[in-house]
């Protein structure tokens, strides 16, 4: 008989049979519990909370309505603009001066012309009496008309056909000078320039005089 059997060891250590039964039952209980207990789920690693990213909100920029910014011209541009403005003013002044001088010259010319007309009117009007003998003397009569002199033509000493030719020539001359020709007697014609008027009675009374001042 072995000395290491279960009963001998239990008696040696003072363990009763009830205690043996307790251990046997406990082992059976643990075995049944292990069989009946559902398998434990493997412990999942605790998910780490992701670091919350800082959300960036794009806040709309507040734009304040304001007047448009006007760029100031550079110094060179301002200088060019100032020169241009000065040239414009100088040109306007020059043009005004030229216009003023022209007006003054026109006024002076007008005054001179009026003075000349007054002087011409103040001059003694002369009537020249001519008794032509040939047609060629018609040119001499025309020269007196161009000199703004009245001419009293007496055709008593010229033939009739040449007298008609002279009258035709003098008619064209006074027409060109805006003058006048009129018959003041049987064989006497009065030719006057544009700035002179003589009545026929005066011309007939002075027909025998070569020059008459009035």
UniProtKB/Swiss-Prot annotation:
User: Per its UniProt record, what Pfam families does this chain match?
Assistant: SepF
- Biased composition of type Polar residues is found at 55-67, 101-120
One Gene Ontology term from the biological process aspect of the record: division septum assembly
Protein's organism: Enterococcus faecalis (strain ATCC 700802 / V583)
Which PANTHER family does the record match to this protein? CELL DIVISION PROTEIN SEPF
Self-association and partners: Homodimer. Interacts with FtsZ.
Q: Which HAMAP family match?
A: SepF
**UniProt keyword Cell cycle, yes or no:** yes
Which keywords, in A-to-Z order, does the entry hold? Cell cycle, Cell division, Cytoplasm, Septation
Location within or outside the cell: Cytoplasm
Q: Where is the signal peptide?
A: none
Q: Would you tell me the Gene Ontology cellular component terms?
A: cytoplasm
Q: Where is this region: Disordered?
A: 24-120
Free-text function comment from the UniProt entry: Cell division protein that is part of the divisome complex and is recruited early to the Z-ring. Probably stimulates Z-ring formation, perhaps through the cross-linking of FtsZ protofilaments. Its function overlaps with FtsA.
Protein name in the entry: Cell division protein SepF
